[in-house]
Amino acid sequence: MKSLLVLFSYHHNNTEKIANVFEKVLDAQIKTPQQINPEKLQEYNLIGFGSGIYGGKHHKTLLDLADTLPQVTNRKAFIFSTSALTGKAKVAEDHSLLREKLQLKGYMIIDEFACKGFNTNSFLKYFGGMNKGRPNAEDLKHAEEFAQNLKQNLQ
């Protein structure tokens, strides 16, 4: 199974820490949105799209990439993120714009992953930030289990 992770990780590299776990389990390549040639994505069996959450959505570079993707048929993908706040409804909302863009292009979103990340944006920097130490060992373990499940379900 040939896998790719399209990652934009900024500030504290929270999402990159999660992507590194996925990379090992899925034997995947990691590329930034700027490194992607949309026409070459057909070479991959599974593509993960992830970034931190900014203003309730994935980073603009990831969303812009999704807009440029060619139409596909049932290409398997998953979405991942890190953010200051999580919870089932919050994650569903945060992932909704990227999910919709990918689905409109023909991608099947087979699963989604999110966890808390250290955040010092805005006024939080004056208080030492939020979620210091996240993603932590438990978050990384959950990321590994998530990737193992993806791998098993696709074989």
Indicate residue ranges for each PLM-predicted region.
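FMN-binding flavodoxin-like domain, especially the glycine-rich phosphate-binding loop
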Residues: 3-4, 10, 16-17, 21-31, ...
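Short acidic active-site motifs
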Residues: 35-39
